Amino acid sequence: MGVERIKAAFENGKKAFIPYVMGGDGGLEILKERIRFLDEAGASIVEIGIPFSDPVADGPTIQRAGKRALDSGVTVKGIFQALIEVREEVQIPFVLMTYLNPVLAFGKERFIENCMEAGVDGIIVPDLPYEEQDIIAPLLREANIALIPLVTVTSPIERIKKITSESEGFVYAVTVAGVTGVRQNFKDEIHSYLEKVKSHTHLPVVAGFGISTKEHVEEMVTICDGVVVGSKVIELLENEKREEICEFIQATKQKEEA
């Protein structure tokens, strides 16, 4: 399915709620169970983190989750095996969030072959500069897996246009300067930034980094096509407050166009 499965998540004015889970945090059975829960709860896409020892874009909550996964001996191969098993039960799109190092250490061809076997539909690589994306982009295109671009508040408009013109899936618009994590509010310029990104791409635009309340979700999906919620979802899963995740999903759905 690949790119098509991601496209379907945004069809007919649908707003996407994209929760992030760390692969192997709590064990691989927990990963599969969490994906099943998020699918049943109505999440649009699930973003699965590949744990890495030097996660430069991650805030403290996601760093801790990654460390727990690594400390428990979870491997990239193990995560792929868990995804292969749970893919038989769910149709929700899978997007991997991975740093470049684990891809190269695993072997990029082997990594992408495993993505195909596991039914992965897209990949986000936060430390892969646009200028160097040919390291993996041609292989991903051949496999029909979207390389999801990230743009930031400080990205010049010409760069945003260039990055998004050759991309697939959706555009991940980083809404804060700095790392991931819970924020209290967003500055007014974020609204104009998101509108600017939307006006210069044919792809859906999804806001991420720092989104942690239902009010944030409602605010963001009035401007763009969806939200990624990472640190807050990890906290809620850890504290068994799953009903709050369901409330986030409902807040997203209520903003869908008629």
From Swiss-Prot:
Reactions mediated catalytically: (1S,2R)-1-C-(indol-3-yl)glycerol 3-phosphate + L-serine = D-glyceraldehyde 3-phosphate + L-tryptophan + H2O
Record's keyword terms, sorted: Amino-acid biosynthesis, Aromatic amino acid biosynthesis, Lyase, Tryptophan biosynthesis
UniProt cross-references to Pfam families, sorted A to Z: Trp_syntA (PF00290)
CDD domains the record matches: Tryptophan_synthase_alpha (cd04724)
GO MF term set: tryptophan synthase activity
UniProt superkingdom: Bacteria
This protein's GO CC annotations: cytosol
Database matches in Gene3D superfamilies: Aldolase class I
Pathway: Amino-acid biosynthesis; L-tryptophan biosynthesis; L-tryptophan from chorismate: step 5/5
Protein family (similarity comment): Belongs to the TrpA family.
UniProt name for this protein: Tryptophan synthase alpha chain
Organism: Bacillus thuringiensis subsp. konkukian (strain 97-27)
Organism taxonomic ancestry: Bacteria, Bacillati, Bacillota, Bacilli, Bacillales
